[in-house]
Structures are given as structure tokens and as C-alpha cells.
From Swiss-Prot:
The chain crosses the membrane at residues 11-31, 38-58, 72-92, 117-137, 139-159, 164-184, 202-222, 234-254, 271-291, 299-319. One of its GO terms (biological process) is sodium ion transport. Involved in teeth and skeletal development. Has an essential role in the biosynthesis and trafficking of glycosaminoglycans and glycoproteins to produce a proper functioning extracellular matrix. Required for extracellular matrix mineralization. Also involved in the regulation of cellular calcium homeostasis. Does not show transport activity towards bile acids or steroid sulfates. It is found in: Cell membrane; Endoplasmic reticulum membrane; Golgi apparatus membrane. Disruption phenotype: Morphants have reduced head and eyes, a curled body, tooth cartilage that is bent downwards, reduced Meckel cartilage, absence of the fourth ceratobranchial cartilage, shortened or absent palate cartilage, widened palatal skeleton, reduced cleithrum, notochord, and lack of bone mineralization. It comes from Danio rerio. This is Sodium/bile acid cotransporter 7. The lineage of its organism: Eukaryota, Metazoa, Chordata, Craniata, Vertebrata. Residues 1-10, 59-71, 138, 185-201, 255-270, 320-336 are cytoplasmic. Belongs to the bile acid:sodium symporter (BASS) (TC 2.A.28) family. Residues 32-37, 93-116, 160-163, 223-233, 292-298 are extracellular. GO terms for cellular component: endoplasmic reticulum membrane; Golgi membrane; plasma membrane. It is a multi-pass membrane protein.
Length: 336
């Protein structure tokens, strides 16, 4: 395979390296209030584009079918909002015996209490040919559910509570997730024949938007002065976060691919991404609300700032392997 062909095939991985490098060199460009204005372009425009794109590309019957997949939805929401925080709480009982900063450990617990994101899990699921409709439903439903459940979980595990502006957060989710999805579906009704004939690069569009989200996320990470902890603490937290993600992804893969689970290969991919990913977009504002006035808020936020880009990086690196597994699974199930 020639160099140009290799670049075309691996353009997304190359793009990740480039945007992270640029974020490191010029983090001020992609932070809130910077030239990119991510508080608008990422929070509203990028997320809206992702779900409009999904609405335009998804067959209505597939989305309707996903809504009825109750077993899958129950599995995802139970794992991410019940099993995840309890498992991390038990892990932190052990880690509390070490020299790791107490507030960083509390930050890990806040990560566990967060809802799934409304973008990355959908894009990664779509990129490998997983059950995109199920990923969309669980990302949106989990985000709405998390607005109520996450503050309660933080109260239970960390003893912190505050009045949460449910109305404004629900409104934002409705406008950036539900409305674009519906508009995309309506447009598809009128453009179905054209879309089926031309086959627009929906996956490439979503991948470009994801690169924007990665860039903005790393700009925030590199621009945050509170990230400058000692190297050992940072490396320890990064190692713990990647270990948690890999362990939980492996656990979900094992549970969802058993014959008795009743899930297809496409379902397993959607479950794996939706149940292990956590929302930075909802998480950071929620932490600022729930922990308002906390002297150590910045330290509590560090694990979430690391977890979000880590989940996107890990998912992106695993894409080729998951694609290969999906192809092999489909060939096995295809009758000769």
C-alpha cells in the first residue's frame, strides 16, 4: 500500500495526532472565549450537526426499532449509572490506602457518577458499523436521565448536593439532540431517493466533527493551570483511568457477546461505547453547580478532564480491531 493510500485509510488517526499537537501548541484558540468559541461551535453547533447527520442517515424504521430494544437500554443505563459508580466506590476504598491525592480520588468518583456523552459514543459506534440507532437513543436518554440521577449519586457517594437548573439543561439537550434528529429525519423523507443514490459520506462528516471536539477538549486540558500536578500524580491518574476503561469495556464485551445475552455484534459495540463513556459537556457544568464554593473543585475536575479525551483516544485506537471483529462475526453468521 502506497503512502497516499495509507494516509487516506488512516486519515482519522493522523487527524487526532495533528489536532492534539495543535491544541498543545495553541490551547488558547479552542478554549471558551477563544477564536473558535467552543461554547457555541462545539456545545451547540457540533453536537447539533452530529445528530442532524444521524437523523439524515438513519432509516426511520431502524430508529423506531431501536426504541423498542428495552433489554439493551436497561443494560446500558444500569451499567453506567448503577454498576459503574458502585464499582469505582469499592475501588476507591482500596486506593484510599495509597498516597494518591484524596481530591483526585473524589474526582474519580464524580466521573463514575456522570451520564454518557451525547456525541462520542454515537460517532464511534457509527464508525465501526455498530447499532447507531441504539447508541443515539441511549446517549440522549442517558443524558436526560443523568441530569436527575447524577446529582443524587454525587449526594450519595460524596455528600454534596445543590439545586440544579434542570430546565435550562433539559432545554439545551432538547435543542441540540432531539430537534436536529427530528429535522434530519424529516429531511430524509423528502431526500430519501437522492441520499440512497448519491450515498453522502455521513461517516466522514461525523469524524471531522469529532476531531473538532477532540481539539476543543485538549485545548481545555492543556490550558487548565490546575492540570499542572506533579508528574507522578498525573501518570497515576491516567493509568487508573485507562485501566478502568479497558477493564469495563472488556467486561461489557464478555457479557454482551455471550450467546445467552441475545445481543447482536452491532448491539455489543453500541453497548460497549455507551456504557463506558462519560460526558464532559454535562459533567463540568454539573460539577461547578454541585461543588460550588469547594476549594478543591479544580482537583476534583482533573479526572473528568482526563477521562473524556482518554475515552475518545482509546475508542479511536480500538476502531480497527473492533471493525475486524465485526467483519469476522458477520461472515460467521452469514449462511453459505
Amino acid at each position: 500500500m502506497g503512502l497516499i493510500a495509507r494516509v487516506r485509510k488512516e486519515w482519522f488517526i493522523i487527524g487526532i495526532v495533528l489536532v492534539i499537537t495543535f491544541a498543545k501548541l495553541q490551547p488558547s484558540v479552542g478554549v471558551k472565549g477563544g477564536p473558535l468559541h467552543p461554547e457555541i461551535t462545539i456545545t451547540y453547533v457540533a453536537v447539533s450537526v452530529i445528530f442532524f447527520n444521524s437523523g439524515l442517515s438513519l432509516k426511520t424504521e431502524e430508529l423506531a426499532s431501536a426504541l423498542m430494544h428495552v433489554k439493551l437500554h436497561f443494560f446500558v443505563q444500569t451499567f453506567t449509572l448503577v454498576f459503574f459508580p458502585i464499582a469505582i466506590w469499592l475501588l476507591l476504598k482500596v486506593l484510599a490506602l495509597t498516597a494518591i491525592n484524596e481530591w483526585l480520588l473524589r474526582g474519580l468518583q464524580t466521573v463514575a457518577c456522570m451520564p454518557p456523552p451525547v456525541s462520542s459514543a454515537v460517532i464511534l459506534t457509527k464508525a465501526v458499523g455498530g447499532n447507531e440507532a441504539a447508541a443515539i437513543f441511549n446517549s440522549a436518554f442517558g443524558s436526560f436521565l443523568g441530569i436527575v440521577v447524577t446529582p443524587l449519586l454525587l449526594l450519595v457517594f460524596l455528600g454534596s448536593s445543590s439545586s440544579v437548573p434542570f430546565t435550562s439543561i433539559f432545554s439545551q439537550l432538547f435543542m441540540t439532540v432531539v430537534v436536529p434528529l427530528i429535522v434530519g429525519q424529516v429531511c430524509r423523507r423528502f431526500l430519501r431517493e437522492c441520499l440512497d443514490r448519491r450515498k453522502p459520506p455521513f461517516g466522514a462528516v461525523s469524524s471531522v466533527v469529532l476531531l473538532m471536539i477532540i481539539y476543543s477538549t485538549f485545548c481545555d486540558t492543556f490550558n487548565n493551570p490546575n492540570i499542572e500536578l506533579d508528574h507522578l500524580s498525573l501518570l497515576t491518574v491516567v493509568f487508573i483511568i485507562f485501566s478502568i476503561q479497558l477493564s469495563f469495556m472488556a467486561l461489557i464485551f464478555f457479557l454482551s457477546t455471550r450467546k445467552s445475552s441475545g445481543f447482536s455484534a452491532a448491539d455489543s459495540v453500541a453497548i460497549m461505547f455507551c456504557a463506558t463513556h462519560k460526558s464532559l459537556t454535562l459533567g463540568i457544568p454539573m460539577l461547578k453547580i454541585v461543588f460550588e464554593g469547594y476549594e478543591h473543585l479544580s482537583l476534583i475536575s482533573v479526572p473528568l478532564l482526563i477521562y473524556h479525551p482518554a475515552q475518545i483516544l482509546l475508542g479511536s485506537v480500538l476502531l480497527p480491531s473492533i471493525k475486524t471483529w465485526m467483519s469476522g462475526r458477520q461472515k460467521t453468521l452469514t449462511p453459505i
